[in-house]
């Protein structure tokens, strides 16, 4: 395997990356390219699917140029992606009929709210494991079909295809030969029955979405198809692994046993627990989702999605201009001299799990004349840890499983202050991955298993490289006192409902 490699495409919310891994899981190349974000109206977030495709092609080329590795040295390709983001395109031309509607976008909130008002929320939860929310793909499909002239009729004639970003990239790489998704991405559409492992006819009928639009659903580690040689520099390479970003990170963290938990601190923060081979429906607003399907078995997960994590640090940098580099936030937090009396609730786009309150807005509590820039930065960092505790406590309640430690990754987990505070406020060990790119590594592992690059899960476990471990230093009394303050801050935030009149 010395001259063979696995290539992973990691298509995120703000940028695309291509990473090439060797057999030991080492990065041999890492190419990244950002692409534009579109905000047509307040609360709307869209992407141009062709710009994403061009970014993918660009990063593949740059990864080969940077490393000197040849396309014919790639044994398999893994794809991981921002989940829920919805693309609808013309089957013949391959052209999207509208921008991709991004997972963060709230433009379909009215559709989701109407489903709940009409009493369908519980049925949808029982079948899909999800709460009824604009976050997921189903309402986005309905919205596009409603807002593009003639789209519903074209869909009913079988002229249109739907896909999340994994499906779109697979279709493009194979030049339209393969229209598939995987268990993990399908389970985030709000259209997939996670018990029967099939698209749910009742929900499709409810939303008037033609089944002909939908991709075939396959396991996460299998050969789906091959690249067209003209898209991959003369080589036809198997595309053999696929998973939504958070499930890929779970796999990349080698969390193969029930009860193992990972937390990824990206734009949002996503806590995922492997719950084994039976779906465990949450009574407390967590999402039940498919972790991955491999070797003829399907493994389920509980997930808590926090909408604002790393983006809160970006807000401090770009919106508030409190520092120039995100890395400066750590030194500021350490320099803060206050007693943690300031709380920032970063509900910029509502609150995610376990509250699912789309109407909440960001707030700050506990400031005095003596509050400093450093105090404000520290409180914002702490909000990431408090939100994660909200989810972890709920996860314990739902699963009945004690959580002795958490494996963490993602950009904000680089912040030692945040990771120590996370350990303190949870009272458990935090294990930070040595390589924070576990999402791409998970996609690579899935792809490599399908083509024999790695033999089995035991073979993968040999590649685990522990990073830094953070252990709690805070007393139980202090921990619970601080967390009580956070709970009060969230409750007060949710009470504030006033919105100024829109100027015409």
From Swiss-Prot:
Pathway: Polyol metabolism; glycerol degradation via glycerol kinase pathway; sn-glycerol 3-phosphate from glycerol: step 1/1. Sn-glycerol 3-phosphate binds at residues 13, 83-84, 135, 245. It catalyses: glycerol + ATP = sn-glycerol 3-phosphate + ADP + H(+). Glycerol binds at residues 83-84, 135, 245-246. Activated by phosphorylation and inhibited by fructose 1,6-bisphosphate (FBP). One of its GO terms (cellular component) is cytosol. One of its GO terms (molecular function) is glycerol kinase activity. The modification Phosphohistidine is found at residue 231. It is an enzyme of class 2 (transferase). Homotetramer and homodimer (in equilibrium). This is Glycerol kinase.
């Amino acid at each position: 395997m010395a001259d063979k490699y696995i290539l992973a495409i990691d298509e995120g919310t703000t940028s695309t990356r291509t990473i090439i891994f060797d057999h030991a899981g080492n990065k041999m190349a890492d190419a990244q390219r950002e692409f534009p974000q579109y905000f047509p109206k307040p609360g709307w977030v869209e992407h141009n699917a062709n710009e994403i495709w061009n970014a993918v092609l660009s990063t593949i080329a740059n990864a080969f140029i940077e490393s000197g590795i040849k396309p014919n040295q790639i044994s398999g390709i893994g794809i991981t992606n921002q989940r829920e983001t919805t693309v609808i395109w013309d089957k013949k031309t391959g052209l999207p009929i509208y921008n991709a509607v991004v997972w963060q976008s709230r433009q379909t909130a009215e559709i989701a709210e109407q489903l709940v008002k009409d009493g369908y929320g519980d049925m949808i939860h029982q079948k899909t494991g999800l709460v009824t929310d604009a976050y997921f793909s189903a309402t986005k499909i309905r919205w596009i079909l409603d807002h593009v002239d003639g789209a519903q009729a074209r869909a009913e004639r079988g002229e249109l295809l739907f896909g999340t970003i994994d499906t779109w990239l697979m279709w493009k790489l194979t030049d339209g030969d393969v229209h598939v998704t995987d268990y993990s991405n399908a389970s985030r559409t709000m259209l997939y029955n996670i018990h029967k492992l099939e698209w749910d006819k009742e929900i499709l009928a409810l939303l008037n979405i033609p089944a002909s639009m939908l991709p075939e659903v396959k396991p996460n580690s299998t050969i789906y198809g091959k690249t067209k040689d003209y898209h991959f520099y003369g080589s036809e390479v198997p595309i053999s692994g696929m998973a939504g970003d958070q499930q890929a990170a779970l796999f990349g963290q080698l969390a193969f046993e029930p009860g193992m938990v990972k937390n990824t601190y990206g734009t949002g923060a996503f806590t995922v627990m492997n719950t084994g081979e039976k779906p465990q429906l949450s009574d407390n607003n967590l999402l039940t989702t498919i972790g991955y399907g491999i070797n003829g078995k399907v493994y389920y997960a509980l997930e808590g999605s926090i909408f604002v994590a790393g983006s809160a640090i970006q807000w401090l940098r770009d919106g508030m201009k409190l520092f120039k580099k995100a890395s400066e936030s750590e030194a500021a937090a350490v320099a803060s001299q206050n007693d943690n009396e300031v709380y920032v609730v970063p509900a910029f786009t509502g609150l995610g799990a376990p509250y699912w309150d789309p109407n909440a807005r960001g707030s700050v509590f506990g400031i005095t004349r003596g509050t400093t820039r450093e105090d404000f930065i520290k409180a914002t960092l702490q909000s990431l840890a408090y939100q994660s505790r909200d989810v972890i406590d709920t996860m314990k309640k739902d699963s009945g499983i004690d959580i002795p430690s958490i494996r963490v990754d993602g950009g904000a987990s680089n912040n030692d202050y945040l990771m120590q505070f996370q350990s303190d406020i949870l009272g458990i060990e935090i294990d930070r991955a040595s390589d924070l790119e576990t999402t791409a590594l998970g996609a690579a592992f899935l792809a490599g298993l399908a083509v024999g690059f790695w033999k089995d899960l035991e073979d993968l476990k040999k590649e685990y490289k522990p990073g830094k471990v953070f252990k709690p230093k805070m007393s139980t009394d202090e921990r619970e006192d601080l967390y009580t303050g956070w709970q009060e801050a969230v409750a007060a935030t949710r009470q504030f409902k006033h919105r100024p009149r829109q100027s015409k």
